[in-house]
């Protein structure tokens, strides 16, 4: 009897341990399962984001041949050369000028057009479509259109103004001209985001303000701007980042010229890599641009806590 009791006890304990083991395996599988679904994303990010970023850091501290193959490690020598280069500082100045010329007008014009389209007027749908058209045009065809507009002899702009200014060939006007094209390209996206925010403002708020005798400008300042501040923050963020990364229209319209008057940092990176064959210098400049954009982004998110009002 004692032996049978011991056998039964062992069998029960084995069954319990098996159940516990299966339960633990099931629990472990449940916890690990979400990570398996993330593996494809990790592979893609690893191949196309993390690996290129690490390779850029390594190349920025090395010398390379004309094919971009690493020859030897040189530490921070490339950064020292860049930081003592007048061309690099010119690119920094041109980049910040371009960012200011593009970001502020793009946001302001997009907001004013959204205010106009939000009013209940005849033909609003037509206006909305017209304002959205630039968003559907790529930088290459846009550059062709604006090259014709800016043409010094046959361009419609000089014809209207009665001048013969070389908008893209005169260093005084080239950066402004490229900024105008970029603003035009940005307006559509800014418009649609801000118009969406305006349409989400409760009409009761505006009606109450009107009953209280508030002027239109007062309503915009005290009601509209706080209510659309999340969309406004997003639009400002996107426009700043896009302005720092602008390349296509600059390459097609001016190729960084005349002189270096439109040679923004991204175009300087392109020129160093594919014209001068100095991939290490291009990588070093790319990392500096990354740091600048990171600082700008952190400053924006610091401002978000004070200036953005979520409903």
Regions found by a protein language model. Name each.
Residues 1-28:
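Short, Lys/Arg-rich, polar N-terminal cytosolic tail immediately upstream
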Residues 29-311:
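A structural signal for multi-pass alpha-helical bundles of membrane permease subunits
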């Amino acid at each position: 009897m004692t032996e049978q009791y011991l056998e039964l006890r062992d069998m029960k304990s084995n069954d319990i341990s098996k159940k516990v083991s299966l339960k633990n395996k099931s629990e472990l599988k449940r916890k690990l399962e979400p990570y398996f679904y993330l593996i494809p994303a990790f592979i893609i990010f690893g191949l196309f984001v993390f690996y290129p970023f690490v390779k850029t850091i390594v190349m920025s501290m090395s010398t390379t041949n004309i094919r971009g193959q690493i020859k030897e490690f040189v530490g921070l020598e490339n950064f020292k050369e860049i930081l003592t280069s007048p061309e690099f500082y010119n690119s920094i100045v041109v980049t910040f000028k371009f960012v200011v010329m593009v970001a502020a007008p793009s946001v302001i014009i997009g907001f004013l057009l959204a205010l106009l389209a939000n009013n209940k007027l005849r033909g609003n749908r037509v206006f909305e479509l017209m304002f959205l058209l630039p968003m559907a045009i790529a930088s290459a065809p846009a550059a062709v259109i604006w090259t014709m507009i800016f043409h010094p002899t046959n361009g419609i702009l000089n014809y209207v103004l009665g001048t013969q200014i070389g908008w893209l060939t005169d260093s005084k006007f080239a950066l402004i001209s490229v900024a105008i094209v970029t603003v035009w390209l940005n307006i559509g996206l800014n418009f649609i985001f801000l118009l969406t925010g305006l349409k989400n403002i409760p009409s009761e708020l505006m009606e109450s303000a009107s009953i209280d005798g508030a002027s239109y400008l007062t309503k915009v300042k005290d009601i509209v701007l706080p209510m659309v501040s999340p969309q406004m923050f997003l639009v400002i963020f996107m426009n700043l980042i896009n302005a720092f990364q602008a390349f296509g229209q600059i390459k097609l319209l001016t190729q960084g010229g005349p002189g270096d008057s439109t040679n923004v940092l991204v175009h300087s990176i392109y020129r160093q890599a594919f014209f001068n064959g100095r991939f290490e210098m291009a990588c070093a400049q790319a990392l500096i641009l990354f740091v600048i954009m990171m600082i700008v982004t952190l400053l924006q998110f610091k401002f978000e806590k004070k200036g953005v009002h979520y409903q």
